[in-house]
């Protein structure tokens, strides 16, 4: 307590009196000098507590109140302040003034009657209970303010503040004021109290007044002056603290700050506080709808708010808040305005998009037009009050419609004008686009595939550039190119179909030979549709290869009209017509052909089958489902490793019918097991109804777990596997050929390819395997096939509706999805007819593999391809089968007006006349035709039924007698099928009362084939014996002697006399006049006694075959050959054959002659038949001089039309092909990839071995290659066509043999030709186990080649080149450098880098041609090799990139040199030297030649 009091005592207290001019208005003017404001600011400095108005005119009552208390001074209260030395002090402030009575306007009378000057100088003030003064409003309302009394009612004044007003006061003279102040000062000075002069209102001060005041102060001793402004709160505290310093001498002297410097500090403080307050407001207030009371309450506790209110007051704070609110509202309105203006163009586009409607309307008229639009209210809103920004619509955020009064603003009018301009520009751009497109369509220079860079100069002009960007024209050009390319492709595909006869005559397979492709070039080369794709050779190549694939492998999926293939349409029509209750029961039967299930046999001993089955199952889903091309298939595997004669190891069980078989081997013993098992399986089903195992698709796979692709044992296994695959006519896959791995490295892609092949086989079986045999004729009397062309301009419904709507139409009993049964009255009896409706491409495969009594062939009269396919089909149909041609037209008027329709109708009718067929035309526009239209044709079929069945029976007897028939039907008998297993639809060929064949017959083998095959197997006696025995059995499956029931003999000329009525009543002849020779030209020297059962000569007539005429009575009709023709040297020259021929020479010519094909009877069929004599059956792999010689010898003596098909008058074609293939296969097979050369008399230890065995680090180049290249560069660089012209095969073989014996062989001394040396060098690379460019690198090379930028492409290729194995890289560098040198002499040798790449890329790369992708990628391979040759210095010698010859930098030809497909001239032409022969035409299919073709040049 004592301490507190001591501390209180220590706080000094000062009583300060503020004096200055006072009095009436006469003395002081209209306002005072600011004493009250100065006191107010010092005592209560907060802006809200500061009052500017303090009146001195009071009423008597106010004067007498406790605040004034009848005194002429005011007590302002007590103030605590901390001075500069941090010492706190208290100050009591008193203001000496003079109050004026509001009645008399004279000073109020008070207790002290002295004048103001004396009263103001008083140092003792007393006024009992006098209250502290706040403001004028306090007077009379003292209770509403704080009531604080003057302490003790008295004060002793310690100092005076003498105020001088330096502003320009109203009605006041400053000099008079100064006189008053001077007198007052003199009076104050008498008190000896400190005095400080305070200049008030300096914010409005007059410079002269301030200067005079300072002059006055200077005239007085130690009189200090402080410049202040109470309103601006400048130096107010400084005035009082200065006086306190004078009062208390112990305190330091206060520094007096000039007014303007102090004002600057105060302004900075206020500005800082304002910025902080504005930041606070912007942070708190986000919505323009906020109000001040709520916001001020939120800010009450914020220092920023408190500081600003203290300095500037609440009103200014509120004013700033309102300004912020106004700004937020303005920003909000502007945002809404921008949104509305942004939506306005969209509204214009939606409501007035038509330029014609608004082109000449002003904005005002357009506004009226907008109101009439149906969707006006969707875009605009009409407000009751305007303008829109002054209404509550601005806060309606859900309504985004545009206020309609916005249209009256200038921005809206500008947007409307912009909209008009946009519409006008769009119209112009559309006109430019149309004009550009018309230019494209009419310009003769725009052809499919022409690059934009070449076309631009022909079609662009300045107007086009003015209105549209070039990218737009490029886009239009690209779309136009796509259209014309698609159209050109469609037209080219139609062209290929129009030449269907050519493709079927050439008998193309998966690897067509270059000679056959040359024929395609010759025939199609002049067609405009062929030339149209000149710049798209890769696409044209792909279309040709795709069409070849279709011809070779016709399915619904490969059909050019897919998915609108006729077969699919027919299946849908028939399935929708008939609901078969038996379908449910058929799901579990053996005849189920559901392609969603794959049954696969895996054959291999010693655990091979089981291991592969486990690997395949690992690739399946949990429920044994396998995904192929995105579709799920159920996969059922049956691994077999034991004796297949045992039921447990049988290929087929009551619940498992195989669709294919994978045969595995890894040794000679396991290969022998495969051969024995296949033989046993085929023998067990040979004479049975379900003999489809004979044609089960097989795939032979060499298992090599180590992944070793070298070594003599592996090569021997590969070679033997290829020989066995050739014998069995199955696919062979080995680890080096297609990336096949086994064990952990099984190739899922290859497994998928195998399964796809099985699916294709099943689909083909769906079309042809459901027919019954002759034995089933009790159920079906006739089998008719109706052929339709896919893609014809008529609906299959029009053709089938009369059939399906007939009441006699029933579902086929065999469950075929393409067949129906008809019961029609033909003659005196009703006949059951099985009508199969198929596409032409499906019908090709059944012409000789299925019993068909007649064909109804449809074609469109206005489509060339339709009639072309019909001609191709009829070429291979026997002339005893009746044909009904049906032409579909658009009506009689169309026929008269359309030359094509008229020509095709005429041609169809002429074909029918020449083949003695029937012809009719049906307008598609007329009501549907009736079945009665075909009644005459059905009568012809009935008349020829017996001879057709007898002929088919004989053909199948010959077929059953030789199980070595190729699993893939011969193209001559039908369309060739890739990996298909079309079964013979006939199940039994014998009468039901006995078996024609005996399964345990033992027949001798062919010794010559045996010996040859033994040599091939390299001394493997066990396998040699098995294969020789197997081969002999395959070739000698003739029926043993049988004892049939006594046949009922009859004279065929009597029973079949109707066949010889061609000269009566216009009946058509159905048999050719050429002699009928047995199709199986059996050689008694090759066969044992059972031969007599079939072809033993008879005394008067020879039984050719027997037909079950009436199965219920067991009668056998024996058809005899009354006039057997001479063999004309075409047989084997045996005595028995010559004797038989001698017996027949003098016999009378029979009216019955052997059936021939329609091609021999009709001049309009087989127009490309001449090409058949030029080529052998099969691909280039099967071509060779020995086979050619054999075919030439076999065809000698045949003249005329039959010369093109000698087998038809000699022997059964299937047996002949088998024997010929066996002889051919005794030669060296053509594996892929090709292993080393294996010849019967010479085994090389240099050629055909891995590259690493013939090079060393010291000599990285094989010495043979080095010798060859040195010889060629020394003598052959000027040789025309070097590397393109093949050398003599025997000389190349001799060269290799001699070098193999002596590595120091001197080529110059031996006098070998340059072409021989060049061919031997190419042969060296062809015979390498792996190509010089490794397969693993070829993929990277192709990816690098796809880069468009030329320089980047070359650098990418160079990086791939660095990854080559060292040996391969060195040899490749050596060879490419040599070829580069050869190309530099192209003016002489005519071998440019392009020509050299065409010759060398198959040798160096040897790609796999088993897929369409590989075939179509050949252009990339050739171009890659060409780039290596061209840029040899860059790739191998770090030289800069050079420009290719004949191409400007950056030109398309420089970027990607092209190789023409089916063109006779290279893409890059080189000038020929004067008087030199023209360049040798490049082989059209050279880009498609595989490594085997290269080997063929060397053998």
Swiss-Prot record:
Q: Where is this region: Has GTPase activity, required for proper localization?
A: 1-266
Residues flagged as site, Arginine finger: 1284
Using the UniProt annotation, give all residue ranges assigned to the region (Required for phospholipid binding and regulation of the substrate preference).
Answer: 1213-1236
Entry-linked InterPro entries? FF_domain, FF_domain_sf, P-loop_NTPase, pG1, Rho-GAP_domain, Rho_GTPase_activation_prot, RhoGAP-FF1, RhoGAP_dom
What Gene Ontology terms for biological process does this UniProt record contain? axon guidance; axonal fasciculation; camera-type eye development; cell migration; central nervous system neuron axonogenesis; establishment or maintenance of actin cytoskeleton polarity; forebrain development; integrin-mediated signaling pathway
Instruction: Point out residues bearing the modification Phosphothreonine.
Output: 1226, 1480
Per UniProt, subunit arrangement is: Interacts with the general transcription factor GTF2I, the interaction sequesters GTF2I in the cytoplasm. Interacts with RASA1.
Please quote what the entry notes about the protein's domains. N-terminal part (1-266) has GTPase activity. Required for proper cellular localization. Mutation of this region is a severely defective loss of function. Mutants have defective morphogenesis of neural retinal tissue, agenesis of the corpus callosum due to defectuous midline fusion of the cerebral hemispheres. Mutants show defects in axon guidance and fasciculation. The pG1 pseudoGTPase domain does not bind GTP.
Q: What is this protein called?
A: Rho GTPase-activating protein 35
């Amino acid at each position: 307590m004592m301490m507190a009091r001591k501390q209180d005592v220590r706080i000094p207290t000062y009583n300060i009196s503020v004096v200055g001019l006072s009095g009436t208005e006469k003395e002081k003017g209209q306002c005072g000098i600011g004493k009250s404001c100065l006191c107010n600011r010092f005592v209560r400095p907060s802006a809200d507590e500061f009052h500017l108005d303090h009146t001195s005119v009071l009423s008597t009552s106010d004067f007498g109140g406790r605040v004034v208390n009848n005194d002429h001074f005011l007590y302002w209260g007590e103030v605590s302040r901390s001075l500069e030395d941090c010492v706190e002090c208290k100050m009591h402030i008193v203001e000496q003034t003079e109050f004026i009575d509001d009645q008399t306007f004279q000073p109020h009378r008070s207790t002290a009657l002295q004048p103001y000057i004396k009263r103001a100088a008083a140092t003792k003030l007393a006024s009992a209970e006098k209250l502290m003064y706040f403001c004028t409003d306090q007077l009379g309302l003292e209770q509403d303010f704080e009531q604080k009394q003057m302490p003790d009612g008295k004060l002793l004044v310690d100092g005076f503040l003498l105020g001088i007003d330096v502003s320009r006061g109203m009605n006041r003279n400053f000099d008079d004021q100064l006189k008053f102040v001077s007198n007052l000062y003199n009076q104050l000075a008498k008190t000896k109290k400190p005095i400080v002069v305070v200049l008030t209102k300096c914010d409005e001060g007059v410079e002269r007044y301030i200067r005079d005041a300072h002059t006055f102060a200077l005239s007085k001793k130690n009189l200090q002056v402080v410049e202040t402004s109470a309103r601006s709160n400048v130096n107010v505290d400084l005035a009082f603290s200065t006086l306190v310093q004078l009062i208390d001498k112990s305190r330091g002297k206060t520094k007096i700050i000039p007014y303007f410097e102090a004002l600057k500090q105060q302004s900075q403080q206020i500005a800082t506080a304002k910025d902080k307050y504005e930041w606070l407001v912007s942070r708190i207030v986000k919505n323009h709808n906020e109000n001040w009371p709520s916001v001020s309450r939120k800010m009450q506790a914020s220092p920023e708010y408190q500081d600003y209110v203290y300095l500037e007051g609440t009103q200014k704070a509120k004013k700033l808040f309102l300004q912020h609110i106004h700004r937020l509202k303005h920003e909000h309105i502007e945002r809404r305005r921008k949104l509305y203006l942004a939506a306005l163009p969209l509204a214009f586009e939606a409501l007035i998009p038509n330029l014609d409607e608004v082109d000449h309307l002003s904005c005002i008229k357009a506004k009226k037009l907008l109101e009439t639009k149906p969707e006006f209210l969707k875009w605009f809103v009409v407000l009751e009050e305007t303008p829109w920004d002054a209404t509550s619509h601005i806060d309606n955020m859900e309504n985004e419609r545009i206020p309609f009064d916005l249209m009256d603003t200038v921005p809206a009018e500008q947007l409307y004008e912009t909209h008009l301009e946009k519409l006008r520009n769009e119209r112009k751009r559309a006109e430019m686009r149309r004009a550009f497109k018309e230019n494209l369509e009419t310009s003769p220079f725009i052809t499919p595939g022409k690059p934009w860079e070449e076309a631009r100069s022909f079609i662009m002009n300045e107007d086009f550039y003015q209105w549209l960007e070039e990218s737009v024209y490029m886009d239009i050009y690209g779309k136009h190119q796509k259209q014309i390319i698609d159209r050109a492709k469609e037209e080219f595909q139609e062209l290929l179909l129009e030449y269907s006869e050519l493709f079927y005559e050439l008998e193309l397979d998966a690897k067509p030979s270059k000679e056959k492709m040359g024929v395609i070039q010759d025939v199609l080369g002049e067609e405009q549709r062929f030339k149209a794709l000149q710049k798209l050779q890769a696409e044209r190549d792909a279309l040709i290869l795709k069409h070849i694939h279709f011809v070779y492998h016709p399915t619904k999926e490969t059909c050019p009209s897919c998915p609108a293939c006729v077969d699919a349409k027919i299946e849908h029509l028939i399935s929708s017509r008939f609901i078969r209750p038996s379908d449910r029961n058929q799901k579990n039967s053996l005849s189920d052909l559901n392609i969603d299930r794959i049954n696969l046999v895996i054959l291999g001993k010693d655990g091979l089958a089981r291991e592969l089955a486990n690997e395949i199952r690992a690739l399946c889903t949990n429920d044994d489902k396998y995904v192929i091309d995105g579709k799920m298939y159920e996969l059922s595997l049956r691994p077999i490793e034991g004796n297949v004669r045992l039921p447990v190891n049988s290929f087929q069980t009551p619940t498992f019918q195989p669709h294919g078989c994978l045969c595995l081997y890894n040794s000679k013993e396991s290969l022998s097991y495969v051969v024995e098992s296949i033989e046993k399986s085929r023998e067990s089903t040979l004479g049975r109804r379900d003999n489809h195992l004979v044609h089960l698709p097989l795939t032979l796979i060499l298992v090599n777990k180590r992944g070793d692709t070298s070594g003599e044992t592996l090569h021997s296994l590969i070679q033997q596997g290829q020989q066995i695959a050739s014998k069995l006519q199955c696919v062979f896959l080995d680890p080096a050929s297609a990336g096949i791995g086994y064990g952990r490295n099984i190739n899922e892609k290859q497994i998928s390819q195998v399964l796809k092949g099985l699916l294709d086989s099943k689909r083909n079986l769906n079309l042809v395997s459901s027919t019954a045999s002759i034995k089933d004729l009790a159920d079906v009397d006739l089998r008719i096939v109706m052929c339709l062309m896919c893609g014809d301009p008529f609906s299959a419904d029009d053709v089938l509706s009369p059939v399906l709507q007939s009441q006699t139409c029933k579902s086929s009993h065999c469950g075929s999805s393409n067949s129906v049964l008809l019961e029609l009255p033909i003659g005196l009896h009703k006949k059951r007819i099985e009508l199969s409706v198929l596409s032409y491409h499906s019908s090709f495969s059944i012409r000789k593999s299925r019993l068909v009594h007649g064909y109804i062939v449809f074609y469109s009269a206005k489509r060339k391809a339709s009639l072309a396919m019909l001609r191709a089909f009829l070429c291979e149909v026997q002339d005893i089968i009746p044909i009904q041609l049906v032409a579909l037209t658009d009506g009689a008027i169309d026929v008269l007006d359309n030359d094509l329709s008229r020509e095709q109708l005429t041609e169809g009718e002429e074909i029918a006349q020449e083949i003695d067929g029937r012809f009719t035309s049906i307008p598609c526009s007329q009501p549907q035709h009736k079945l009665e239209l075909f009644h005459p044709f059905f009568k012809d079929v009935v008349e020829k039924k017996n001879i057709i069945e007898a002929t088919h029976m004989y053909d199948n007897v010959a077929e059953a007698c030789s199980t070595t028939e190729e699993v893939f039907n011969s193209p001559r008998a039908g369309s060739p099928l890739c990996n298909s297993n079309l079964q013979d639809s006939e199940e039994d060929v014998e009468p039901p009362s006995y078996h024609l064949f005996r399964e345990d017959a033992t027949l001798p083998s062919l010794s010559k084939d045996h010996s040859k095959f033994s040599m091939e197997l390299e001394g493997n006696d066990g396998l040699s014996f098995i294969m020789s025995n197997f081969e002999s059995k395959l070739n000698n499956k003739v029926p043993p002697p049988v004892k049939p029931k006594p046949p009922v003999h009859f004279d065929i000329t009597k029973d079949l006399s109707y066949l010889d009525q061609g000269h009566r009543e216009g009946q058509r002849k159905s048999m050719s006049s050429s002699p009928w020779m047995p199709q199986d030209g059996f050689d008694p020297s090759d066969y044992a006694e059972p031969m007599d059962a079939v072809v033993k000569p008879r005394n008067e007539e020879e039984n050719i075959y027997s037909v079950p005429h009436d199965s219920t009575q067991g009668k056998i009709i024996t058809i005899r050959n009354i006039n057997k023709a001479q063999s004309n040297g075409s047989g084997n020259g045996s005595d028995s054959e010559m004797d038989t021929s001698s017996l027949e020479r003098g016999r009378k010519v029979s009216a019955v002659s052997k059936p021939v094909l329609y091609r021999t009877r009709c001049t309009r069929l087989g127009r490309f038949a001449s090409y058949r004599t030029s080529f052998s059956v099969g691909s280039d792999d099967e071509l060779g001089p020995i086979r050619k010689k054999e075919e030439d010898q076999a065809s000698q003596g045949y003249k005329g039309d039959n010369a093109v098909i000698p087998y038809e008058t000699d022997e059964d074609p299937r047996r002949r092909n088998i024997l010929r293939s066996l002889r051919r296969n005794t030669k060296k097979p053509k594996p892929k990839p090709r292993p080393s050369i294996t010849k019967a008399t010479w085994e090389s230890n240099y050629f055909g071995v891995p590259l690493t065995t013939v090079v060393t680090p010291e000599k990285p180049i094989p010495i043979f290659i080095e010798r060859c290249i040195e010889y060629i560069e020394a003598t052959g660089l000027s040789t025309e066509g070097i590397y393109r012209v093949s050398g003599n095969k025997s000389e190349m073989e001799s060269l290799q043999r001699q070098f193999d014996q002596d590595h120091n062989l001197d080529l110059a001394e031996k006098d070998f030709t340059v072409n021989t040396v060049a061919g031997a060098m190419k042969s060296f690379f062809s015979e390498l186990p792996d190509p010089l460019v490794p397969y693993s690198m070829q993929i990277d090379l192709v990816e690098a080649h796809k880069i468009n930028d030329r320089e980047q492409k070359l650098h990418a290729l160079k990086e791939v080149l660095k990854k080559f194995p060292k040996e391969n890289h060195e040899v490749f560098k050596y060879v490419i450098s040599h070829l580069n040198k050869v190309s530099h002499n192209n003016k002489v040798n005519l071998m440019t880098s392009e020509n050299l790449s065409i010759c060398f890329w198959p040798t160096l790369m040897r790609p796999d041609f088993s897929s369409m992708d590989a075939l179509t990628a050949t252009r990339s391979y050739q171009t890659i090799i060409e780039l290596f040759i061209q840029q040899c210095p860059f790739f191998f010698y770090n030289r800069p990139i050079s420009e290719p010859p004949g191409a400007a930098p950056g030109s398309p030809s420089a970027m990607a040199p092209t190789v023409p497909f089916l063109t006779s001239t290279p893409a890059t032409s080189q000038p020929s030297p004067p008087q030199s022969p023209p360049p040798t035409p490049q082989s059209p299919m050279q880009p498609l030649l595989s490594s085997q073709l290269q080997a063929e040049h060397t053998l």
